């Protein structure tokens, strides 16, 4: 059997493996479909993650250096690529009561022919309803961060909303904002194909940031007022600068991206200073949730799964391209790393 592994920075390969015996609380899944994570995972793949030499210390709530003799946060050769899998249970441990052999499930896991997952008190291992879409299922993770971004920005009926970056998170945020009652939804992305999809699913306008004063265009489209909410998913300094320029007085930027380091030139002394801008950093998996105890990571996940499975959210167009597992190393390097403009969220079939 084979699994997709990062053997070196920016190098993916299929590597042979043998499954261990499952524990009493586990199930083994034969994977049929899967998808990688195009945001934080590719940062790891490029060896650009702070987690390589540092760890986020929960006690101090800050990054601290890893001890010199401790394992690195990412070890190439062992680093398995992939985020979500859909497949069929082929083996159950003796303590597993909520699942049975033959069940079709979705869960967190790497791109490999089989995945072993805890199946006792694990709500994250989801049963696939009859006839449900695997493409919607593998968007379970990005949907959570999109929902968190929309909720943390307090999008309300009638708001002018802008979503910057139309990858999977941004595309889902477009749908959620429109369905939440936003009167004008604007997408921002330089890739025409992504903009076409956003328009099909709720965007009233799309802007190409290349050669465009995005902030001024947002003001123009909203009668000079600006956006009540801007959801920033791209992580680029220019995008945040434009968002501050296009934000309405007292508006909110929901910063969802795991940002790249900003180069010299980013300026908080212009529109941000005069327009009482608010920036909220949004991360679905940071606990406690801003709306705790009413909302938690679990409630976000439960809600997203329901919306994905009942068709409220439509992610069929987002899984593009779809490649075979046999071709996944080359496809990962091309579509996820080297040419991300050629994809939104890559799907994998086994």
From Swiss-Prot:
Cofactor: Zn(2+)
A Pfam family hit: ADH_zinc_N
Known catalytic reactions: a D-guloside + NAD(+) = a 3-dehydro-D-guloside + NADH + H(+)
UniProt keyword annotations, A-Z: Carbohydrate metabolism, Metal-binding, NAD, Oxidoreductase, Zinc
CDD domains: 2-desacetyl-2-hydroxyethyl_bacteriochlorophyllide_like
GO molecular function, one term: metal ion binding
EC number assigned by the record: 1.1.1.-
Cofactor detail note: Binds 1 Zn(2+) ions per subunit.
Top EC class, one word: oxidoreductase
Family per record: Belongs to the zinc-containing alcohol dehydrogenase family.
Role: Catalyzes the NAD(+)-dependent oxidation of the hydroxyl group at C3 of D-gulosides leading to 3-dehydro-D-gulosides. Probably functions in a metabolic pathway that transforms D-gulosides to D-glucosides. Is also able to catalyze the reverse reactions, i.e. the NADH-dependent reduction of the oxo group at C3 of 3-dehydro-D-gulosides leading to D-gulosides. In vitro, can oxidize D-gulose and methyl beta-D-guloside, and reduce methyl alpha-3-dehydro-D-guloside and methyl beta-3-dehydro-D-guloside. However, the actual specific physiological substrates for this metabolic pathway are unknown.
Protein name (database record): D-guloside 3-dehydrogenase
Source organism of the structure: Shigella flexneri
Name of the gene: ycjQ
């Amino acid at each position: 059997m084979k699994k997709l592994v990062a053997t070196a920075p920016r190098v993916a390969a299929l590597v042979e493996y043998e499954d261990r015996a499952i524990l009493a609380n586990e199930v083994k899944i034969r994977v049929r479909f899967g998808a990688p994570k195009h945001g934080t995972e590719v940062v790891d793949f490029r060896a650009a993650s702070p987690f390589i030499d540092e760890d986020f210390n929960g006690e101090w709530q800050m990054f601290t250096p890893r001890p010199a003799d401790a394992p690195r946060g990412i070890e190439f050769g062992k680093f398995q690529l992939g985020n979500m899998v859909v497949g069929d249970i082929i083996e159950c441990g003796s303590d597993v009561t909520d699942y049975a052999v033959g069940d079709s499930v979705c869960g967190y896991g790497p791109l490999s022919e089989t995945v072993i997952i805890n199946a006792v008190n694990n709500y994250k291992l989801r049963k696939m309803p009859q006839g449900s879409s695997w493409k919607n299922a593998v968007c379970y993770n990005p949907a959570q961060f999109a929902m968190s971004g929309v909720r943390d920005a307090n999008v309300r009926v009638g708001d002018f909303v802008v979503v910057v970056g139309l990858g999977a998170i941004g595309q889902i945020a477009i749908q959620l904002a429109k369905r939440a009652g936003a009167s004008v939804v604007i997408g921002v992305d330089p890739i025409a194909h992504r903009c076409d999809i956003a328009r099909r699913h709720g965007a009233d306008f799309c802007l190409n940031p290349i050669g465009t004063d995005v902030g001024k265009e947002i003001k123009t489209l909203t009668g000079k007022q600006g956006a009540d909410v801007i959801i920033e998913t791209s992580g680029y300094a220019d995008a945040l600068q434009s968002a501050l320029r296009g934000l309405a007085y007292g508006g909110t930027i929901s910063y969802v991206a795991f940002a790249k380091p900003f180069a010299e030139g980013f300026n908080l002394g212009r529109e941000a200073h005069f327009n009482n801008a608010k920036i909220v950093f949004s991360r679905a998996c940071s606990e406690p949730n801003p709306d705790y105890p009413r909302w938690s990571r679990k409630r976000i996940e439960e809600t997203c799964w329901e919306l994905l499975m009942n068709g409220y959210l439509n992610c069929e167009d987002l899984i593009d391209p779809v490649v075979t597992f046999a071709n996944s190393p080359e496809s990962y390097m091309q579509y996820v790393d080297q040419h991300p403009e050629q994809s939104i969220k890559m799907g994998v079939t086994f």
